[in-house]
């Protein structure tokens, strides 16, 4: 839990100034990760690989600015969740909340997050029919 604000002038400056500068610097790497790594991972339903890519992006561009803004305490929790075996861990775009995607069942997830002093706030199922990639010549 954090009492750091995510709405206001300071946050706007963070995301629109520092975040955009960092996005500009990391644009080539992020584009490469999306095109060369994420799309194939999505096509292959490779959740672990998707999680590794998102984990890398968490510390690039505007996501890095958000993690820094919310203190490295959020990184600490995210890192512990990854170490616990969750395939996909990232900070939500409306942080400071952590999003996980996993193949583990709810009982396993509850046990792990409770052990870290966290709780499940929202749970949803993935719509595996939502992405369709069509190749044309």
Could you say what each language-model-derived stretch is?
Residues 1-69:
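Active-site rim beta-loop-alpha module in soluble metabolic enzymes
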Residues 42-137:
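Glycine-rich, charge-dense phosphate/pyrophosphate-binding loop(s)
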């Amino acid at each position: 839990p954090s009492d750091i604000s995510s709405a206001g002038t300071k946050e706007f400056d963070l995301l629109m100034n520092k975040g955009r500068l960092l996005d500009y610097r990391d644009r080539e790497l992020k584009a490469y990760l999306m095109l060369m790594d994420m799309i194939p991972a999505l096509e292959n339903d490779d959740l672990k690989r998707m999680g590794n890519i998102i984990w890398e992006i968490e510390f690039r561009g505007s996501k890095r600015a958000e993690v820094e803004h919310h203190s490295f305490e959020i990184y600490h929790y995210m890192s512990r969740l990854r170490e616990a075996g969750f395939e996909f861990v990232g900070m939500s775009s409306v942080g400071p909340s952590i999003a996980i995607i996993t193949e583990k069942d709810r009982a396993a997830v509850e046990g792990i997050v409770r052990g870290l002093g966290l709780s499940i706030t929202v749970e949803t199922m993935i719509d595996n029919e939502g992405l369709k990639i069509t190749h044309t010549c």
